[in-house]
Structures are given as C-alpha cells and as structure tokens.
C-alpha cells in the first residue's frame, strides 16, 4: 500500500523537526532532541548517487538519539525514465531500513528541469515527479514531494500530484500554500529567518509537521513496517562508533591527499 488515499487536510502541528545535509556538518542529535525536535529528514542522495553522509554518518547518530526519521532525494531528472531510475537508486539506498517519516522527491529551481524556466515544460516536470513518486510508492514507501510554494503553484500541476503529500518550503512567518500539505519548511522566527537549532553550529531548516506520520506509516504497513517491529536500534552504538572512526580516518587521508595535490600545483605554478 502506498501513500495514495492517506492525504488529509492540514491540522494543528503535531511534531517539529529539522532537515539536514552535509552542509550541517557535525551534529549533536541528543541536543536536537532535548530542544523539542522529534524527527530528522536526511538528504540521502542526488541524481544517481547516494551520499555517504546518509547511512555512513547521520542515520546511525539519529537512531542512537532515538529520533524519528525520513529521507529526501534531490532529483536531476529531465525525463520520466530518468526519474524512475533515480527513484530506484533511492530505494536501493534505503535497503531494509524502516523510516518512520515519508521519503521525498526534491524538485528544485537549480535542477536541470528547473532551469527550463517558468511555464516551460510544466507538464513534463509533473510527469517526472509522478514517475519518481510512483516508483517509491510501488516499492512500499510513503512517498511525498518536497518543493517550494512557488514551484507547487506554478512549475508543476500540483492537482495531478494530489495523491502525494507535499512538504512545502516557504521562508515566512506562516505557510500560505493553498493546497493540502503535511509538512512546512521554514527558518523559524529569529532575525532574518535563519533557522537555528541546539546541537548544530550552522543554520538549519526547521519543519512543522501536521500529521502523525509514524502512526500512519506503521498502521498502513508502509516503509517496511509490514513485518514485526524492530527490537531495538538498527545500528548498535558500538557499531556506530566504529563507523565514525573509520569515516574520520578516511577523511584525514583525503585531506592529506588534497593538501599534497595543492602543494604540487603551487610548485609548478610558482
């Protein structure tokens, strides 16, 4: 069963969370949770590439902190076939993981299809989104579309995507999108609308959620929750620490290699 038919009218805020990518750097998720945020939406990849920070860095730490989570995938697709292939890579990246929040397609102005311009290729963009989301849904996931308010109003035919929950980006005092949506991304009420969250040293997007996604997903057997409930942490703390140490060692080697290359370049330029 997919997300079709589960889209409901917006209600009161039921949970607050954040969404993250590698731009957020190191995060203390215990502090995030203590500040009242209960879920994290993690950038899992882009185009046909999974990001190492998804399963190798952020997800183990999110689980260790006891936070709910979902994931999103930046789409570079300009054809329906490309969209399906991207979604298949996303599904492969999710593997046997069981997110408690939806998994989202991310359509952006900076993407290839976004660069076509306003009202150019609107139907194709809609078809691309539908193909991506249908692929996720057919794989058993609660699929949703992340996009800005303007994108949903002008760059795709949102009515053709009404069976999928919307995660609306609008950096304002309130969300004024007229359609149904399950989550609103904003920057909070600090000066400049730059989101801040304890445990994160750089700006981060904040999110208000209007649906009890963990309950909906589990009740409908989506995202792998059709079988028995997990008995504990998917990634034990010890394994997480081992993964973190390995990642840090690789990063050190990478930084050293970059420094050596820069030294050689400087030598020959000098």
Task: Write out the residue ranges for each language-model feature.
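Short beta-strand/turn micro-motifs composed of small residues
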Residues: 73, 147, 170
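Heptad-repeat coiled-coil/leucine-zipper oligomerization helices
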Residues: 232, 236-239, 243-246, 250-253, ...
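Hydrophobic anchor at the start of a short beta-strand
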Residues: 69, 142-144, 166
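Short Gly/Pro-enriched loop/turn and capping motifs at secondary-structure junctions
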Residues: 110, 150-153, 171-176, 188-191, ...
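Glycine-rich, charge-decorated loop segments at or immediately adjacent to ligand/cofactor-binding or catalytic sites
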Residues: 82-85, 151-161
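Aromatic-lined carbohydrate-recognition surfaces of secreted/lumenal glycan-active proteins
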Residues: 136-154
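Substrate-binding cleft of extracellular glycoside hydrolase catalytic domains
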Residues: 2, 10-133, 137-140
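Functionally critical loop-and-helix segments that line ligand-binding/catalytic clefts
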Residues: 2-24, 30-31, 157-233, 238
